[in-house]
Amino acid sequence: MTTWFFTPRGLMHKDRDPVLGEFFTTDSIKTIADSIVRESIQNSIDANSGSGPVFVRFAVGHGSRAETEDLFSGLWEHVGASDEGAGLLSAENNFRYVTVEDFGTTGLRGDPEDVMGNAGDKENEFYFFVRAEGRSSKSGATRGSWGVGKYTYLDASMINTMFVLTARGGNGPVGGNGPLAIGMAVLKNHRIENPDGRSDIYTPDGYLAEVRPLTGGDYAGEDAILPFGADSDMPERIRAAFNLQRRDEPGLSVVVPYVPAELTYDELVRSVARNYGILIGSGELAVTVVDETGNETTLDSDSIRAVLEGLEASPEQQELIDELSLALWGAGLTAENRTELGEHPLENMPSWQTDVLMTEEQAKTIRDALTSGENLAVRVPIPITPHADAVTRWSYLDVFFGPSETKRTRPHFYRQGLRISEVKSESVSGLRSLVIINDPELAAFLGAAEGVSHVEWSATTARFAGKYAYGQNWIAFVRGAPHQILRRARSAEEDEDRELATDY
């Protein structure tokens, strides 16, 4: 009989109750849907196999206790011991779940028998997803790289549980192409009473998995928790129980059981459009959201504008539509259609007061575009100098301006399609502004400065602090770009007027 396994807490174990899910709730990530959508899609984009756009499917479904009871065997007593309220859910006949599946991706690669991370970081996602916490095989150049994104799934489940199904591409990868399946739960430390009157205390982590001896390596012959493989019926049982679409296509499928009522189809559609509308509009991503009745919405480059227009009317809705239009306009520009500022002297501390950044001719071009109500694109060169090798690599960001009927609007920042939603930047008057960071060098620099929720940049993160020349100053320089570009252009006109007045 298949059952869940939890490890008894030993004398050397810490009394640890995980809190990682709490880090994904911020001012701009207000709903469970936002957490799941932002984390899952950024991981899917990072896992792009290179064969074309990434496709992600979210589905909301209903499960019954009778049809899924075997998948939860041995779990409920641990859930109830950890959280009495969550344990009561075992008596309910029906429950809601959400599935997240990606296609056009690599799946969780790596040897499933690598229980200690000996295979290193490269192409070893299975180890980092299943066996590691707070560690990742990614770098700052990728959209997510803290190794805790999976906790958004666990946090969304009222029993802190998920099921994982993955298939891998390639010609005979170690551990096979799959599909591989495993259940994971992260509860609290909990105590279970035994019939003899004694009790056992268990650590938070539980698995629905095979426990069998390893077949090779330094730990050959020792028992380990391993996923169910293609020779087991478990991948098919999980697929059938939760109506997963994956057969043997490379990629990752995650099931989040027992989700709360507020995680709905409408919230998922709204969150995808809000957080990834620009990336979808570019053609790099397509998303389908399916509800409990089979009704679905597809968000792709052909439909994203219509989906945005179909959202509930609000200032945010119009803002998203205008941002999409501005971003798509900017994406098609050539060098002669944008203004490229000068390179900042490397020996000077980053400052928008530096004279060589903007010529008088460029300032006039910017003012003329603003006066005529046209869209405007400005490219800003940014030097990246890691202390590790002291070699400067020039990168850039693009700022797009467009007319707005709103008096003052806050600039919005996108790093490789991900909306960095809480960047503190001064508002601009009468204009909409987007800062687009797609170049890998600057994306890696700023990605290293992001926390686990990827909503702001800070020079104090462990992956950023002390790693770059003038690192903190360049972050401030990027934040201030929209306001400072306009200030420089307008101050040049004021200087010109003063000179004319003096001559007169």
Functional labels for PLM-detected ranges:
Residues 1-101, 109-114:
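Bergerat-fold GHKL ATPase/HATPase_c domain
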Residues 53-57, 96-98, 150-152, 160-163, ...:
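Beta-sheet entry/capping signal
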Residues 81-179:
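Flexible ATP-lid and adjacent glycine-rich G1/G2 motifs of the Bergerat
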